Each structure stands twice: as structure tokens, then as C-alpha cells.
Design a protein with these regions (language model features):
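N-terminal secretory signal peptides
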Residues: 1-19, 45
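N-terminal export leaders
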Residues: 18-39
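Mature extracytoplasmic/periplasmic domains
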Residues: 48, 328-408
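Early extracytoplasmic/lumenal segment of secretory-pathway proteins
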Residues: 49-118
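A structural signal for short loop-to-beta-strand junctions that line the ligand-binding cleft
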Residues: 101-105, 122-189
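Glycine-centered hinge/linker elements that transmit conformational signals in sensory
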Residues: 225, 230, 242-274
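Extracytoplasmic/periplasmic substrate-binding proteins
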Residues: 267-336, 372-375
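Conserved C-terminal helix/tail region of periplasmic/extracytoplasmic solute-binding proteins
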Residues: 397-443
Length: 443
């Protein structure tokens, strides 16, 4: 981060914030259009004949870069969008070492920081983003509902802005140029099998409780897994951290040493790196508590296996969710009509269809007002308001997931987001942390 902004010019709707009341008000009037309602008016705005042969390659992790979303974008925009999935480490490596093989890089804040520093991205011109003024203040002021978003780790607000399109350093505060356009985010915690655990889980320390020896698992993505571990050890009172999102070497050593001891004691049944692995472990009952992503919990439920996403609201200076945000970045090689098409694609993403789609497996849109138009009133009530489902709730593909009366784990959008305690990150000691994490893996 290079400097604070002293000339923020964004005094638009997003500057007013989005209050608990305005976010959570009923959707009956606004939610008339459901998913699959057809092409959106106004797309594309450049001549269809000129863009019909264009193909954009959007690369990133499977929970963010989804084929069904690319297919709908292609249908609505008139040019082809190809989605390619890589895990977190492989994706950032591809962006940096093979930048010309990617058009749209799907990045988290820490990846945007790294890719910007390496000079492989070009800035996104804020004036060309039609819904920018309606983006939530999480991304324009670093706050929501009057509550400042925590700065442990790298919050999206800290990684979003640069001073000019070819800048290689971040700038704190809204400018005319962005490193990435946020498209999906959430608050992560643990998943558990209530039928096998036997009680409600609301604290991270449960993941390392000896009573779950041989039945627990943790995420094996070093930069994220170590933060889940830190939340556990902090919750249990075993380790105190100055900043879980940017640990000292001493804190890294304490954390990894504790993980290695747990592994040697047989505590972890497995570590996992992919969505499917986490679903299989939980659905089969091989593990009964683990680090987990929201759509993975949903996927277990679709199999008619009970699974709960632990509500880890902050208390006594501990607990809280691990926040993350993925967004779309423009690779530096884009120019001409292909760059124009990329802007059409970015604007399509915030126009509502994608926001409605991802809501159905528990993720949030940076512009809920457009996503709401593609959700039924019942879906909005369940996913955003945290209200009991007025009717059965289905996943993005129409598969029944929740019965009437079910409530979302963790409550409303505002309740969940204001209980984030840290964000996915790239630590200053990342190289050392990765070395120590590998020692944990082979222990």
C-alpha cells in the first residue's frame, strides 16, 4: 500500500452505504425476473457483427469461474466466453508466467496485489463500469452498515485501486482505475455433520478438539489453510497473534509446529485442496468437521446428508469468519475490440444474472440490487435476509436444497459480513510460510 487517498471523489450511492434496513427490505416488488429469463437489454453496446468472432478466456478457481455463467454471458453478449479452471496456486502462476494465454484473470485481493506488482494487468477504467456507483461500500469505503471492514489480511478495498492504468503499486482509496472488479465474495468458516458431532459448533477451536481426532480435515492451500489454523489456535487460547493476516516468523513457527503435532497425533483424517474432495469427505462421513466453502456445504445437503456451516460470530476478541473476494482483472495484452468486449463482459457480470446464480449457493454480489432482480422474493429472504425460507429453496441448477422454514447458517448478509475477522492474504513472510507448510504436509 503506497499512500492514503485524500481526494476520494466517489460520493455516489455507494458512498451512502447500504444499511441493514435497505439491504434486507422485502424483495416482492423488485424480484420479478428469475434466472434464465433471457438476454439483458442493452447488451452488447458495440456492434454485434464486429464482436461475434471474439473469444474471451476467463481463468480462475472453480467456485468463481463457472461454466454455466460463461455460457449465459455468451448467450447474452453475442461472443464466446470460455471458462478455464485452475487451483489457486496454478492460477496465479499462469497469470504471471503466461499472461498472454489469459484474457480475464479471476483474482483475490492478494493475487491482484501480486499480479499488479509483476506488471501483467492493465487498470480497469472506473468510468466504464456502469454499476460502479451501486457497488457496496465494502469496496469503495472499506465499511458496511457503519462497521469498518477488518484489515487483518488483505481486504478487497485495500487491493482494488491504482493511480494509473499501468501502475504497479496499489493506492488506498477510490481512484479512476481499478486492479480488479469484485464479482463474488463470502465469509468462510467450518462445515460439520450435526448428526455425528452432536452439538452446535460456533467456535473455531472445535476443529482441533481432541474429541474429533481422526475425523477432522483442513484446507491444504497454504495461504488460506494457515489462517484457518490460526483462527483455531487463537480460539483455543493456544497462540496470540498480532495480525493473523501477516504473521511474523515466530507466529508462523508456532502455528506450523502445532499443526505438525496434531497431524502426528492422528487428529487430521485428511487435508483437501478441491471443492469435490471436501464434499466427498463430508458426505461419506470420513470427516465430521473441517474447513469448508459454502457451496460445498450446499452440495452435501443436496445429497440429503445433513451438513451445517458453523456460525462463528466474533466474541471476546476471537472467532469471526475468514473473508474472501474474487474479482475480474484485465490482462495487459488486451486492446481494441477485444478490450471493448472485455468491458462488456465486466458490465454484464454486475447486471444481475450472475449475482442471482451465485446467491443460490451462498455467495454474495457486490451489487445486491441487481442480483435481487434475478432472485424470487423467497430466495432473497433466505439468502440475503437470513429469514426462514417461505418456500423450498433450490441450488443454482434447480436441485432442491432446503425445505420450507430452513434458515441460512450465520444469519443475514449484514450479520455475516460484519463478523468477518480476517481476509485471505499474501503475507510478507509468504516464502517462509510455504516452506513451513510443506513440512506440515510431509510430517
Amino acid at each position: 500500500m503506497t499512500k492514503k487517498s485524500d481526494n476520494v471523489t466517489n460520493n455516489s450511492k455507494s458512498g451512502n452505504g447500504i444499511s441493514r434496513r435497505s439491504v434486507m427490505k422485502g424483495a416482492a416488488a423488485a424480484a420479478g425476473a428469475a434466472a434464465g429469463s433471457g438476454a439483458l437489454g442493452g447488451f452488447p453496446t458495440i456492434w454485434a457483427q464486429e464482436i461475434k468472432d471474439i473469444e474471451l478466456t476467463h481463468v480462475g478457481v472453480s467456485y468463481s469461474v463457472v461454466k454455466a455463467i460463461g455460457d449465459q454471458a455468451s448467450k447474452d453478449l453475442g461472443f464466446k466466453v470460455t471458462m478455464q479452471n485452475l487451483d489457486t496456486s496454478a492460477a496465479i502462476n499462469r497469470f504471471i508466467t503466461q499472461p498472454n494465454s489469459v484474457d480475464i484473470a479471476d483474482v483475490e485481493g492478494w493475487q491482484a496485489k501480486l499480479a499488479t506488482k509483476r506488471g501483467v494487468l492493465q487498470g480497469i477504467e472506473r468510468a466504464k463500469i456502469k454499476e460502479f456507483d451501486n457497488i457496496l461500500p465494502i469496496f469503495t469505503k472499506g465499511e458496511i452498515d457503519g462497521v469498518q471492514i477488518p484489515r487483518q489480511g488483505i481486504s478487497p478495498y485495500e487491493a482494488m485501486y491504482i493511480e494509473d492504468p499501468m501502475a504497479t503499486d496499489l493506492h488506498e482509496g477510490v481512484t479512476d482505475w481499478m486492479t480488479f472488479l469484485p464479482q463474488v465474495y463470502n465469509a468462510d468458516s467450518m462445515g460439520y455433520r450435526p448428526d455425528l458431532v452432536g452439538h452446535e459448533v460456533t467456535e473455531w477451536k472445535e476443529l482441533i478438539d481432541p474429541k474429533f481426532k481422526g475425523k477432522a480435515a483442513i484446507l491444504d492451500v497454504p495461504a488460506i489453510g494457515i489462517m484457518d489454523a490460526a483462527l483455531c489456535f487463537e480460539s483455543a487460547g493456544m497462540i496470540e497473534y498480532g495480525n493473523k493476516g501477516n504473521m511474523t516468523r515466530e507466529e508462523i513457527d508456532k502455528t506450523i509446529d502445532a499443526l505438525i503435532q496434531l497431524k502426528r497425533d492422528g487428529h487430521f483424517r485428511a487435508t483437501w485442496t478441491t471443492f469435490d474432495q471436501s464434499v466427498q469427505l463430508m458426505a461419506a462421513g470420513e470427516v465430521i468437521i473441517q474447513s469448508m466453502w459454502s457451496p460445498a456445504v450446499a452440495a452435501v445437503r443436496v445429497k440429503e446428508v445433513p451438513c451445517i456451516y458453523a456460525p462463528v460470530n466474533k466474541k471476546n476478541g476471537k472467532e469471526g469468519y475468514r473473508g474472501w473476494c474474487n474479482g475480474m482483472a484485465l490482462m495487459r495484452h488486451l486492446e481494441g475490440k477485444k478490450l471493448d468486449a472485455a468491458y462488456e463482459y465486466l458490465n454484464w457480470y454486475l447486471s444481475g444474472w450472475q449475482g442471482g446464480f451465485v446467491a443460490r449457493y451462498g455467495y454474495y454480489s457486490p451489487v445486491p440490487t441487481t442480483a435481487q432482480k434475478f432472485l424470487t422474493p423467497a430466495e432473497w429472504a433466505y439468502w440475503y435476509e437470513g429469514a426462514p425460507a417461505p418456500e423450498p429453496i433450490s441450488d443454482p441448477y434447480g436441485v432442491p436444497m432446503e425445505p420450507v422454514g430452513a434458515k441460512r447458517d450465520g444469519g443475514s448478509f449484514v450479520e455475516r459480513v460484519t463478523n468477518i475477522s480476517c481476509w485471505n492474504t499474501l503475507m510478507d513472510e509468504a516464502a517462509y510460510m510455504n516452506k513451513r507448510w510443506n513440512e506440515f504436509k510431509v510430517a
